Design a protein with these regions (language model features):
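Catalytic cores of alpha/beta
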Residues: 17, 25, 29-50, 132-167
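Active-site-adjacent loop and "lid" segments of alpha/beta metabolic enzymes
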Residues: 84-95, 125-128, 135-136, 144-148, ...
Length: 194
């Protein structure tokens, strides 16, 4: 889940909805959007969210990531959103000057175990993930890598699985009906719920 309102406003306006989904779904909920401080993490944790995704703040405040990992361990993931290899922040509009692989290595050195990689150029395009960029990232770090952006069909899921990626985020493909979700779970596998 991404709390777009929280990302914009810096407040948890969707807290009740997120908490309800966490309580009633029986699934591990992963959420990002506007997580900028330890207080934000505490609030998101209180909603029942299992994995908390730090995005732009990982670039602007690396010490926050260190503290988050110290307190929450592998429940912290970092979003790595890149365009032409450069990490972008602030809703993908600000350049950071950081190469996505160098950024991933830095996050790994802080103890981050899960990276969510979005190639901005493919997000929402149903054109397939950026397999080459994902392969480069996978060779550079030992983190669990989740592919986000461009996943368009079940063949993409099978290829990501063959590459050894930890997971994939399916968005537009589900809403557009270009992927069979049950088959995607069967092909890609799933992490066990607690």
């Amino acid at each position: 889940m991404v709390d777009l309102d929280g990302a914009k406003s810096g407040s948890r306006v969707n807290a009740a909805i997120v908490k309800e989904v966490a309580e009633q779904s029986g699934m591990r909920i992963e959420m990002g959007g506007g997580i900028r401080s330890m207080e934000d993490l505490q609030a998101v944790d209180a909603m029942g969210v299992w994995r908390m995704v730090i995005g732009s703040a990982a670039v602007t405040d690396p010490n926050f990531v260190k503290e988050a990992v110290r307190v929450y361990g592998d429940r912290i993931a970092v979003g790595c959103d890149a365009l032409n290899g450069e990490v972008k922040t602030a809703g993908w509009v600000e350049g950071s000057g950081l190469d996505y692989v160098d950024f991933a290595k830095q996050m790994e050195s802080f103890g981050v175990k899960t990276l969510i990689f979005t190639d901005i150029a493919t997000d929402g395009m149903l054109s397939g993930p950026s397999f080459a960029a994902l392969e480069r990232l996978q060779k550079a770090v030992s983190c669990q890598i989740v592919a986000s952006g461009g996943v368009s069909n079940n063949e993409d899921i099978r290829k990501l699985k063959e590459m050894g990626l930890y997971g994939a985020i399916i968005g537009k493909a589900y809403y557009a009906g270009t992927i069979d979700l049950a088959q995607a779970v069967a092909d890609g596998g799933s992490q066990d719920n607690p």
